[in-house]
């Protein structure tokens, strides 16, 4: 899916007790723990078996932007942006721990990511979704202005 640039770029106002922070060179163990906690229920597998070197080459790349959502000091979600193909930027991952789903925080995270992407002066924004994602994901992306531009079938082996 890709988004037209009609979305709001107003800064997101976070509820009390929440902060959405850029984490440069996130520790690999912290990333793996957050990725697994957020993504296991949704069968996120493509990063699970990477070596430290492979993972670091992705998430520590200067064109990769990781933002973590915290409730107090506890990470409860994250967004990962990939700007390696700039002026195209991909929202690679967006997700929350299960207890935080349904509170509107996913929408706030995507809106904050879109504001950051707009500041980069991107010309195209990509986000991928699939039938394994939370049922609210696709309707959220559509409400925010994303439209489907391609469809493909992929087999995921989750061991």
For the regions a language model picked out, list residue spans one by one:
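Short acidic/polar active-site loop segments enriched in Thr and Asp
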Residues: 65, 123, 147
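Conserved GNAT acetyl-CoA-binding A-motif
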Residues: 117-129
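Conserved active-site tyrosine of GNAT-family acetyltransferases
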Residues: 137-141, 146
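Conserved glycine-rich acetyl-CoA-binding loop
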Residues: 97-111, 120, 132-136
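Acyl-donor-binding surface of acyltransferase catalytic domains
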Residues: 1-24
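A conserved beta-strand-loop-helix scaffold within acyl/acetyltransferase catalytic domains
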Residues: 48-53, 59-98
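Helix-loop element at the rim of GNAT/NAT acetyltransferase active sites that forms part
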Residues: 23-46
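Conserved beta-strand-loop-alpha-helix junction that forms the acyl-donor binding cleft
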Residues: 101, 127-137, 154-159
């Amino acid at each position: 899916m890709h988004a037209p640039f009609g979305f709001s770029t107003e800064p997101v106002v976070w509820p009390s007790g929440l902060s959405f922070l850029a984490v440069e060179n996130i520790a690999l163990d912290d990333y793996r723990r957050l990725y697994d906690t957020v993504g296991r229920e949704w069968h996120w597998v493509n990063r699970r078996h990477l070596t430290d070197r492979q993972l670091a080459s992705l998430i520590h790349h200067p064109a990769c932007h990781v933002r973590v959502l915290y409730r107090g000091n506890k990470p409860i979600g994250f967004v990962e942006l990939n700007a390696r193909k700039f002026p195209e930027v991909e929202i690679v991952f967006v997700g929350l721990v299960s207890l935080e789903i349904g509170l509107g925080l996913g929408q706030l995270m995507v809106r904050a990511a879109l504001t950051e992407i707009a500041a980069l002066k991107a010309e195209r924004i990509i986000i991928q979704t699939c039938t394994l994602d939370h049922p609210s994901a696709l309707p959220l992306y559509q409400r925010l202005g994303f439209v489907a531009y391609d469809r493909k079938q992929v087999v995921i082996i989750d061991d």
